[in-house]
Structures are given as structure tokens and as C-alpha cells.
Amino acid sequence: MSYYSTSVAKLIEELSKLPGIGPKTAQRLAFFIINMPLDEVRSLSQAIIEAKEKLRYCKICFNITDKEVCDICSDENRDHSTICVVSHPMDVVAMEKVKEYKGVYHVLHGVISPIEGVGPEDIRIKELLERVRDGSVKEVILATNPDIEGEATAMYIAKLLKPFGVKVTRIAHGIPVGGDLEYTDVVTLSKALEGRREV
């Protein structure tokens, strides 16, 4: 016997598919949404649909954008000879909050993780190599998370970049091992970027 009507159960089920949302939080969110005015619910659902329909990946760096080329890649004031490699689009947001990095980015959309069945061909490493191959890149900063998968991915990319003769650096470890860039405070992230080391 279900405690909820079919509609409520379906809403809870869908909300619990979101990352970090367990059954209890999904239930709380569902009842919050149910109690919202209908126009606010429509506005929320429209914002979700619009984001899904309009957003895409930048054709250069693979960050999320609503244009063919994102604002960072199209900004002529940025240093296009320095590429900061991150795992996810949220890492770009974290790095931009520091307000010290003036280069461009490359978003891998994951890390190498044999346990999860993710190999180098499943993330955007090939596209990074193509960007470096054109010869205008002087430095690649590897800013993947300092966990096992992030370290393995950084070392793998560093090895692939050696033949290109570019400077390859790794952000310093003011960031705790196993930590996520997304949740790192601005000062720590700033110091980690400042203290990056050559790989």
C-alpha cells in the first residue's frame, strides 16, 4: 500500500534521481513544490525545459553555454596560450570565482575511472590534444580534483602532452585530497592556482 497518490509518488521518484537528493529530501521537495502557487511551478518547470533546450557545449572548451562559443573563449582579453583543464563545468565556475585566472579552459566532462568503466576515450582528452597541437598553447594547467581518479587523469594527460613541448603544471595541493574544486573556498583555490607545479 502506497502512502502517496500516484502523482506524488512519481514526483518524489523523479526528484530522487537528482544527484545528492535522497528519498527524504525528494519527499520534502515534492511537498514544497505541491504547495507552491501554480504560476511558480510553471515558471520552475519552464526554466528547466528552457535550460535543457538552449544550453550546449562550447565548440572550443566544452563548457556549458547558450552560444556556439562561450563568453570565456570569445573574450580577446583572456590569455588563450594558457589552458586550465578541469573535470566538470562547475569547476570553471569555482575557478572564475577566484578572479585571478586569466587564461581559458578545457572541460573534460569526467575523469578516467576504470572502476566506473570510464576510459580516456570517454572524456574530452582528444579535443585537448587537438587544441595544443596548433602550437599557440604555451601552458596547460591540470586542475582535476586531487582524488585518485583526478590524479590518474592528470598524470595521463601530462604524459600525452610531453611530446608537444608545452609547459604542463598541476595546481598545488591546498585542496584536500579527495576534495572537489566546486566546494573549495576562494582563498584555498587561489593559493592552489598560485602554487601550481610543473609536471
From Swiss-Prot:
Top-level taxon:
Bacteria
Keywords of the record: DNA damage, DNA recombination, DNA repair, Metal-binding, Zinc, Zinc-finger
Q: Which stretches are zinc fingers (C4-type)? A: 58-73
- Gene3D superfamilies xrefs: 3.30.60.80, 3.40.1360.10, 6.10.250.240, RecR Domain 1
What are its GO biological-process terms? DNA recombination; DNA repair
All copies of domain Toprim, residue ranges: 81-176
Q: By its UniProt entry, which SUPFAM superfamilies does this protein fall under?
A: Recombination protein RecR (SSF111304)
GO molecular function, a single term: zinc ion binding
| InterPro entries (UniProt xref) | DNA_Rcmb_RecR, Hlx-hairpin-Hlx_DNA-bd_motif, Rcmb_RecR, Rcmb_RecR_Znf, TOPRIM_dom, TOPRIM_RecR
Record Pfam families: RecR_C, RecR_HhH, RecR_ZnF, Toprim_4
Does DNA repair show up as a keyword for this record?
Answer: yes
Membership in a protein family: Belongs to the RecR family.
- What does this protein's UniProt record list under function? May play a role in DNA repair. It seems to be involved in an RecBC-independent recombinational process of DNA repair. It may act with RecF and RecO.
PANTHER family from the xrefs? RECOMBINATION PROTEIN RECR (PTHR30446:SF0)
Q: What is this protein called?
A: Recombination protein RecR
Organism of origin is Caldanaerobacter subterraneus subsp. tengcongensis (strain DSM 15242 / JCM 11007 / NBRC 100824 / MB4)
Source gene?
recR
